[in-house]
Structures are given as structure tokens and as C-alpha cells.
Amino acid sequence: MPRVKRGTKRSDRRKKILKRASGYFLTKSKLYQAAQEAVERGLKFAYSGRKQKKRQFRSLWIVRIGAAAKLNGMSYSQFVHGLKVAGIELDRKVLSDIATNDAAGFTALAEQAKAALANQPAA
């Protein structure tokens, strides 16, 4: 069986890892094994971070909508329920954008939600 020295395969793989680790502190950017562990750990955090980002943005939207609803004399849950009863189908991202950039528009939505809740029969 012939001897395999791995020439460029090994060096290319190592260079790729060390390039990804550039900017890391001390040995994590210089030594292959430490760099490999640091890069793998970083990739794990990046993967989970992409999932957390979605949750955090949804939470931010809800906080913004809740604050704007409070200014209009409603709680977040009352506001969202009122919109649902009124048949207004806007997602939280859009509602948050309206709340931050168009206060008059949000107030109009809040009034519609209040009217829908007032007209709703008591269950």
C-alpha cells in the first residue's frame, strides 16, 4: 500500500480553519487545535444565535406594541384581541413599525380595536 502524505489537502484544511480563527485571542488564532475548537464553538453560537434572533425580535415587537397600546389606554392583549375581532390582520412586525413611525396611524388602529371590543357581545 503506497504512503500518502496528504500534501495540500491537510494544509488547505488547516489554512481554512486558521483563516476563520483570525482575530481570535492568543493561541486561538495561531495554533491549529485551539483554533479548530474555537471556530467550532463559534459556529455553534452562530447557529443558535440565528434562532434566538427571531425570538428576540418578536419580543421587541411585542414590547413596542404594548407600550403604544398603553398610550392609547389599552393593554397589549386587549389591543391584539380587538384587532382580531375587528378583522384587521396585521402581523406584529408591521404593528411595531406603525407604533414607532406613525403614532396617528396606531391611534386609529387602537380606536378601531376599542370599537370592535365595545360591539362584541359579552361571553
Swiss-Prot record:
Belongs to the bacterial ribosomal protein bL20 family. NCBIfam families: rplT_bact. GO terms for molecular function: rRNA binding; structural constituent of ribosome. Keywords: Ribonucleoprotein, Ribosomal protein, RNA-binding, rRNA-binding. One of its GO terms (cellular component) is ribonucleoprotein complex. Binds directly to 23S ribosomal RNA and is necessary for the in vitro assembly process of the 50S ribosomal subunit. It is not involved in the protein synthesizing functions of that subunit. GO terms for biological process: ribosomal large subunit assembly; translation. The gene is rplT. Disulfide bonds: none annotated. It comes from the Bacteria. InterPro entries: Ribosomal_bL20, Ribosomal_protein_bL20_C. This is Large ribosomal subunit protein bL20.
